[in-house]
C-alpha cells in the first residue's frame, strides 16, 4: 500500500480523454455525413461513444471523491477553479454568437434589404413560446437554489424534491424548444438571421441538455447518499452551470427574440 505526504490527488492513467476525443471526431464527422449524405451511422457511433465515455468518466470521478476519499479540501479548491475557468470559456463561446448577431442586425447589408429582420423572414413572437421558456428556466433557477439550501441544511427529502423539479423543468424547456423549431417559418439556411438564430439557440439548448444530464447524475448520487451538507462540490458545480444557462437564456431572449424581432 502506498502513502503520500501531501493533500493532492495524483490521478491514475485513464483511457477516457482518448475515447472522448474519438467520440468528438465521430460526432463532428457524423454531423457532416448527416447534413450532406443523410447517413446517421457515424453520428450514432459518436453519440454512443460519447455517452459511454461520459458515464464511465463520471463513475471514476465519483468513486475517487466518495469511496477512495481523494477529494480533499485542496483538491476541491482546484476543482472549483477548474469549473470557474470552464464557465468563463463558455461565456466567451456565447459572446462570439452574440457578436455575430449584433454585427449583422445593427448594420444590415444591402443584400438583406438594409432591414432587420431580413425581408421575407418572419420571426417568432417573443410573447408566446419564448416567454414561456423564459418563465420555465427562471423557475428552474429558483428550484435549484431551493435544492442547494436544502442540501446545506441537511434536508434530504426537500433536496431530492427540488432537484427532481429542476430536472423536469429542464426537460420541459427542451421539449418546448423542439416544438418551437418545428413551428418556425424559417430554417438555418435562411441567411444570417436563420444561421445566428438556430446556432445560438441550438447551442444553448445543447447546454440545457448537458445541464439536465449533470443534474440527473447529482439526483442519482443523492439517492445513494453521496452528498453531505459540507461535501457536495459535484452538486455545486451543476448548480453553477445551471445558473449560467439561465443567464445566457435571459440575454438570448432579450437580444434575439425580443429586440431582434
Swiss-Prot record:
GO biological process: mitochondrial electron transport, cytochrome c to oxygen; respiratory chain complex IV assembly
Recorded catalytic activity of this chain's protein: 4 Fe(II)-[cytochrome c] + O2 + 8 H(+)(in) = 4 Fe(III)-[cytochrome c] + 2 H2O + 4 H(+)(out)
PROSITE patterns to which the protein is assigned, alphabetical: COX3
Cellular compartments annotated: Mitochondrion inner membrane
EC number(s) given by UniProt: 7.1.1.9
Source domain of life: Eukaryota
Keywords: Extinct organism protein, Membrane, Mitochondrion, Mitochondrion inner membrane, Translocase, Transmembrane, Transmembrane helix
Recorded GO CC terms: mitochondrial inner membrane; respiratory chain complex IV
Intervals, Mitochondrial matrix compartment: 1-15, 67-72, 153-155, 224-232
Keyword Glycosyltransferase: no
Chief location category: mitochondrion
Disulphide connectivity of cysteines: none
Segments in the Mitochondrial intermembrane topological domain: 35-40, 106-128, 184-190, 257-261
Transmembrane segments: 16-34, 41-66, 73-105, 129-152, 156-183, 191-223, 233-256
Binding partners and assembly: Component of the cytochrome c oxidase (complex IV, CIV), a multisubunit enzyme composed of 14 subunits. The complex is composed of a catalytic core of 3 subunits MT-CO1, MT-CO2 and MT-CO3, encoded in the mitochondrial DNA, and 11 supernumerary subunits COX4I, COX5A, COX5B, COX6A, COX6B, COX6C, COX7A, COX7B, COX7C, COX8 and NDUFA4, which are encoded in the nuclear genome.
Function summary: Component of the cytochrome c oxidase, the last enzyme in the mitochondrial electron transport chain which drives oxidative phosphorylation. The respiratory chain contains 3 multisubunit complexes succinate dehydrogenase (complex II, CII), ubiquinol-cytochrome c oxidoreductase (cytochrome b-c1 complex, complex III, CIII) and cytochrome c oxidase (complex IV, CIV), that cooperate to transfer electrons derived from NADH and succinate to molecular oxygen, creating an electrochemical gradient over the inner membrane that drives transmembrane transport and the ATP synthase.
Record's protein name: Cytochrome c oxidase subunit 3
Organism from which the protein derives: Mammuthus primigenius
